[in-house]
Amino acid sequence: METSELLKKVRQIEIKTRGLSRNIFAGQYHSAFKGRGMAFSEVREYQYGDDIRDIDWNVTARYVRPYVKVFEEERELTVMLLIDVSGSRDFGSVNVMKKEVITEIAATLAFSAIQNNDKIGVLFFSDRIEKFIPRQKGKKHILYVIRELIDFQPEEKKTNIAQALKYLTNAIKKRCTAFLISDFIDKDGFKDALTIANRKHDVVAIQVYDRRETELPAVGLMKIKDAETGQERWIDSSSTRVREVYKEWWERRQAVMNDSFKKCRVDSVSIRTEDDYVKALIALFDKRN
């Protein structure tokens, strides 16, 4: 993409998503994604009803009267965006590709995070770790992330979600909130890796999919291509049975995916490219409150 065109696209996404994060998501984000725990704030004299476990014995000995430690919520988070950049993200049948919706969702989450003084890091993955952007704060960092979301070209086309989750578990030492954004078209299982990752971190799954992935149009003979393997085949979509088999396959796949999220205790939302992702994200945030 030409530099001028890229910068124009970055600016368009910035205007749209920053406004959403500021005007719509600010309150929901803050309450839905709380801090990592309690951090020490100050000491004060002991008052009736205080927990004796909070007594600061050093200060108490110095002043010969009891003092307690006061704690407050440690609000600052580290937010990681795990972005699927495999070949299937370039699919789209209703004027918008999955890649574009993923970019806007990621940018909205990123702006929401920095407005809450959180740090943002990004991991691009296919069936390997394509790129890692260390966590930082600030608008300049977010604009760099958006540029990468728009223009990044992966080395591989296939998907391995488990690989990305293992990297998250091993490489990110401090607990974080991790948004896993993908279409979840992955021939390999990721349930075990998700279970382990969610024990250490707070993983949230966001599925982005296209309507044409859920059912076939009745248009007769059509050639379909696997965007990740490059394999092609002809099918007769005018056949009711062919369309039913395909739809059943999709529904089974969704059921397995949602069952994995449920068993791993991972909050999730599925967003169709033509639908309003704002409403879907608000519903996700509300579910966590």
What are these regions (language model features)?
Residues N58, P154-K158, I181-S182:
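Short, flexible loop segments at the rims of nucleotide/cofactor-binding pockets, characterized by
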Residues E100, E155-A162, E248-E251:
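Conserved phosphate-coordination/catalytic loops
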Residues E104, T108, T159-K166, A255, ...:
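Short, contiguous clusters of charged residues that form electrostatic/catalytic patches at enzyme active sites
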Residues F132-R147, D259, D286-K287:
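Short, electropositive alpha-helical surface patch
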